[in-house]
């Protein structure tokens, strides 16, 4: 369960990398997911990360000599990692993206269980007039998460955020961006496992053209994604609400 290898990438010939949220298997072909192709020096960096992962032993030790994980940068693009018990830079990068926004924040995520500090940052931005938009999968493969996230969604909606639940089969994308063209794209969900426990990788890019494409895809999915309202929470059954509160207590471990 812990120290899970959750990063997803394909590195080709030391010059091309595909990264994002997609798993490999026939079962996943019907899921809505997002992946990014990057050419250049980052392809070589991901080859080095692949070698680095061979240093991961069964007891969770890393042979850090295989890779300098403190400087994973190509031009203005920066690769951030969550390395269990070592680095939590993806969370720091996401907090910066949220706090630096002036007009809008967009988040696509499979799981939406932000910790208290991150949820408060999103709520504060919404209350300050920043358009906070979150698209999450209404149903995941972990039903406890599906119940627990209702409280997080309810708090953000009450603060003025826009939250949508993807009603297709599964929405597995993981991407965040703001109005400055800052993008964080990769394998990490908004939950404790991705921020602290799994091995994850996310690419930080500054690209207004990419944010335009991501925003276009975001709004295209809203046709099948009901917007959440205060009534979406209050109109649920007593049993559903009770289960939500019980599951929320376990959210730091989900």
Short names for language-model regions:
Residues 1-254:
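Charged, low-complexity intrinsically disordered terminal segments
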